[in-house]
């Protein structure tokens, strides 16, 4: 799994239909202070990756304390998460100018894992709002910092836990 995490003061998502207008079947989602995360899944990802990544995000100390040091977690500040499924995080651009997405998980698996991952985040007591899997979305956010961190379970998880 791969996540691009951005610390935000606010973020929102709308779904766009095939006509290029807002999809009336999707209720726009918005959050206040917290994280906007783009989540990519591979076919090799499973429960171990979900558990490790959710724990890492819930406990990541990237919010300032009273002294201005990044010393507080999203749980500490009572923040929220906006989670967006994003298969393009696994783009391969080695050949030519057109990205290949062969490393991205198959849609059925990726959707299931993304939902399960968001549930793991919620179990940590943090409200999680979501986009719609596979949809064309418009995501808006106000970066706070900016603080942007890429977490990749393939490279960042300790060897014994993969």
Swiss-Prot record:
SUPFAM superfamilies: DTD-like. It comes from the Bacteria. GO terms for molecular function: D-tyrosyl-tRNA(Tyr) deacylase activity; Gly-tRNA(Ala) deacylase activity; Ser(Gly)-tRNA(Ala) hydrolase activity; tRNA binding. Its EC number is 3.1.1.96. A motif (Gly-cisPro motif, important for rejection of L-amino acids) lies at residues 145-146. Its main location: cytoplasm. GO terms for cellular component: cytoplasm. Keywords: Cytoplasm, Hydrolase, RNA-binding, tRNA-binding. The keyword Signal does not apply. GO terms for biological process: D-amino acid catabolic process. It is found in: Cytoplasm. Pfam families: Tyr_Deacylase. It catalyses: glycyl-tRNA(Ala) + H2O = tRNA(Ala) + glycine + H(+); a D-aminoacyl-tRNA + H2O = a tRNA + a D-alpha-amino acid + H(+). InterPro entries: Daa-tRNA_deacyls_DTD (IPR003732), DTD-like_sf (IPR023509). Gene3D superfamilies: D-tyrosyl-tRNA(Tyr) deacylase. The keyword Cytoplasm applies. An aminoacyl-tRNA editing enzyme that deacylates mischarged D-aminoacyl-tRNAs. Also deacylates mischarged glycyl-tRNA(Ala), protecting cells against glycine mischarging by AlaRS. Acts via tRNA-based rather than protein-based catalysis; rejects L-amino acids rather than detecting D-amino acids in the active site. By recycling D-aminoacyl-tRNA to D-amino acids and free tRNA molecules, this enzyme counteracts the toxicity associated with the formation of D-aminoacyl-tRNA entities in vivo and helps enforce protein L-homochirality. A Gly-cisPro motif from one monomer fits into the active site of the other monomer to allow specific chiral rejection of L-amino acids. Homodimer. HAMAP family: Deacylase_Dtd (MF_00518). Belongs to the DTD family. This is D-aminoacyl-tRNA deacylase. It comes from Bifidobacterium longum (strain DJO10A).
